[in-house]
Amino acid sequence: MTRVRNDQFDAAKGLDRGRSKPVEAAWYLLKCCVFLTPLPFPSRLKCALLRMFGATVGSGVVMKPRVNIHLPWKLAIGDHSWIGEEVFILNLEPVTIGAHCCISQRAFLCTGNHDFRQPDMPFRSQPIRIEDGAWVGAQSFVGPGVTVGTEAVISAGSIVTRSQPAQKVCAGNPCVPLKDRWSRL
């Protein structure tokens, strides 16, 4: 017999969704119609809709098609940042993306996890912070509690489970700093 008890998992325990069920349902419908579609709705429209639902979004933000934002009221994006196609932001806790950042195609920013040491596997969520000028490469995973430092580069396909320092090129599984971003070749 297994010690894991998924039947005892309580999705409401330890999680504040931040808005009422009707607001969440309205966001879900809008997200399906405007954000998850391959149709290239203008970034300005998407940013305005995010603001209507409580997100903080700076000027000049570019948002490509098929971006999946779980809870917009727990999202802040700085000026002139770029959110690539099929980026998934699972923000059960706040996600802060600084100014002039690039979150590349299919990157996954995930604030949620489970405590696997307990049989009922309760939520264990922490915020994510992507500082100014950072670049999260395509198909990278950024996990709960991570800060990506100012002007850091996370190479494509990296698994980031610990904070990464400023102005470094970081890569791998697990992601580690490899070299200075601005060093001469």
Residue map of PLM features:
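Acidic, glycine-centered active-site loop in nucleotide-sugar glycosyltransferases
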Residues: 166, 171-174
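Secondary-structure boundary/capping motif
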Residues: 58-59, 98-99, 149-150, 158, ...
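Terminal amphipathic alpha-helical/low-complexity segments used for targeting or macromolecular assembly
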Residues: 1-55, 59, 100, 133, ...
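Beta-rich strand-turn-strand
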Residues: 138-153, 158-162
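Flexible, glycine/small-residue-enriched loop-and-beta-strand segment within the central core
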Residues: 38-47, 66-77, 82-147, 173-174, ...
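Conserved short histidine dyad/triad with adjacent acidic residue
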Residues: 62-64
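Short glycine/serine/threonine-biased micro-segments
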Residues: 135, 155, 170
